[in-house]
């Protein structure tokens, strides 16, 4: 279905008088900018105030949202929130350099692990995602990927658990995030049973347990961070914060990350590797290329140990199904002018050619082209006066 980016664009309806306003440009806010109240969006427990949020569709059940915030000291932080609904056509895979290789089969990969022939080494997260796609029998397509555990930077060996396709490569003294045989996600302490685990990677620290922030987390050392959490409904959340790049992004403390995850609905979460290793790569809906979306502090994507791959198992056929409109689900500062763009997508979110505009208009009567968007505020409410491209929901 075609869904317009914001329900009250083009005068369809007006927002409530107390609607939160946020701007989409620029990423850096003026010192005296009027900001939304922290309690309206995730991340407020540690004094994080959102400035902008930009959500992109990735695939069925998968989104990636860029969140620009200001911390309690007034410094800017840029984070990336990935949300994965495991009830959709999507799953998660652990990966390691050399495990998935050209033309390999599950039987060959199992024999490699059982025979102790998987060598410790490092490669980029995006390279591991590409290798998954070149194996002969892997399912689906990698649509999002992120780095995982701490590792020995000399050898590439992860410090904690690593299980791929049910093959136990390594254990350790760290808690681990796992996908079970029934497809659900869990986080378990070190030493837990792994007989029902299909995929697993570790992280050195628990951040959230039983819906509460773990006591004693560091509150001062702000740097790039990465993490994974699970909500009560079973959906999975990745959250990465860029850092060491002031004034663009100072980074976050462990406590701030835990606070953000808790406010995002996570009932359990672990910390993954941060620093220059922190990587988020995604293939946005309507495109075919997996690209690094965050800003690694090294200036480029670092080689890492293991990774987590988000795999869409939906059918990518290249046939036009809908338009992927960006930006999506945003609110804008009064007076902003916002141009929308559209890409063709198939039913799985893969790239597809957009039909010619006259045909699209003929088959989609709720497609409306109007003037550039301009949002103006009066003392009582915000009014939408139109947008470049507005698409009402088509049932």
Regions found by a protein language model. Name each.
Residues 5-171, 186:
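Zymogen propeptides
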Residues 53, 146-219:
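Active-site-adjacent helix-turn-beta-strand microarchitecture at beta-sheet edges
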Residues 64, 68-72, 77-83, 202-233:
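Conserved beta-alpha junction segments in alpha/beta enzyme cores
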Residues 155-172, 179, 213-267, 277-322, ...:
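Conserved, well-ordered active-site substructure
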Residues 330-336:
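Short, solvent-exposed loop/linker segments at the N-terminal edge
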Residues 361-383:
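Low-complexity "stalk/linker" and mucin-like segments enriched in Ser/Thr/Pro/Ala/Gly
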Residues 379-395:
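A short beta-strand micro-motif common to beta-rich folds, especially ectodomain repeats
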């Amino acid at each position: 279905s075609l869904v317009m980016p914001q329900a009250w664009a083009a005068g369809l309806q007006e927002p409530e008088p107390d609607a939160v306003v946020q701007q989409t440009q620029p990423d850096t806010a003026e010192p005296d900018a009027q900001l939304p109240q922290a309690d309206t969006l995730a991340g407020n427990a540690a004094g994080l105030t959102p400035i902008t949020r930009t959500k992109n569709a990735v695939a069925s059940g998968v989104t990636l949202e860029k969140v620009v915030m200001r911390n309690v000291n007034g410094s800017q932080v840029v984070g990336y929130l990935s949300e994965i609904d495991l009830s959709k056509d999507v799953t998660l895979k652990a990966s390691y350099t050399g495990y998935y290789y050209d033309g390999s089969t599950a039987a060959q990969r199992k024999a490699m692990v059982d025979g102790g022939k998987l060598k410790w080494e490092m490669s980029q997260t995006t390279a591991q995602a590409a290798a998954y796609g070149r194996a002969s029998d892997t399912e689906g397509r990698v649509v999002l990927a992120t780095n995982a555990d701490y590792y020995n930077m000399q050898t590439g060996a992860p410090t904690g658990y690593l299980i791929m396709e049910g093959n136990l490569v390594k254990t350790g003294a760290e808690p681990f995030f796992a996908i079970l045989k029934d497809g659900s996600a869990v986080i378990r302490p070190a030493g837990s049973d792994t007989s029902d685990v299909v995929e697993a990677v570790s992280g050195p620290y628990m951040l959230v347990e039983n819906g509460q922030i773990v006591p004693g987390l560091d509150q001062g050392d702000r740097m790039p961070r990465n993490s994974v959490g699970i909500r009560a409904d079973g959906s999975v959340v990745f959250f990465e914060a860029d850092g060491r790049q002031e004034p663009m992004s100072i980074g976050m403390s462990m406590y701030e990350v835990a606070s953000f995850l808790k406010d995002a609905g996570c009932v359990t979460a672990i910390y993954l590797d941060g620093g220059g290793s922190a990587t988020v790569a995604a293939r946005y809906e309507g495109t075919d290329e997996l690209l690094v979306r965050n800003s690694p502090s090294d200036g480029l994507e670092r080689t890492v140990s293991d990774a987590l791959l988000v795999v869409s198992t939906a059918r990518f056929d290249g046939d036009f199904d809908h338009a992927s409109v960006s930006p999506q689900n945003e609110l804008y500062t009064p007076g902003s002018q916002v141009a929308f763009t559209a890409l063709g997508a198939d039913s799985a979110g893969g790239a597809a050619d957009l039909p010619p505009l006259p045909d699209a208009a003929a088959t989609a009567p709720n497609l409306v082209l109007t003037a550039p968007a301009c949002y103006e505020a009066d003392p009582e409410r915000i009014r939408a006066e139109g947008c470049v491209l507005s698409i009402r929901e088509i049932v």
